[in-house]
């Protein structure tokens, strides 16, 4: 289960992102990127709604959570099965159809998710 934590918005094997990545600093810009889309990687499919909910599945487990935008960071809490993951504020970068989430306000592990 600990592995699931890192895959979901923190990291395991992240694909490389080119240096043209641009930081997403605005809630409205973030919502425009994810609204009506899924965020995916191997074994993971998530939806992030404009209303502040997170849902989906990862490695056969249901994922639920909430998110807010706070001072330029995506801040989320999540639950996978019966495990609750505390709030973590993450720096978000965009490169084409990919988003990179960097935990701990940009100082932590990364997770790359494709926008579909």
Spans of model-derived segments:
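Lipid interaction determinants
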Residues: 5, 14-116
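Sec-dependent signal peptide recognition
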Residues: 1-7
């Amino acid at each position: 289960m600990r592995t699931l934590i890192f895959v979901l918005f923190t990291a395991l094997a992240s694909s490389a992102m080119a240096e043209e990545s641009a930081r997403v600093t605005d809630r409205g810009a973030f919502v425009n990127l994810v609204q009506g889309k899924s965020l995916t990687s191997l074994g993971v499919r998530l939806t992030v709604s404009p209303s502040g909910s997170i849902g989906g599945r990862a490695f056969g487990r249901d994922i639920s959570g909430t998110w807010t935008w706070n001072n330029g960071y995506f801040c989320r809490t999540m639950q996978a099965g019966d495990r609750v993951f505390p709030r973590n504020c993450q720096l978000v970068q965009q490169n084409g159809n990919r988003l990179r989430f960097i935990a701990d306000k940009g100082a932590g592990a990364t997770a790359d998710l494709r926008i579909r």
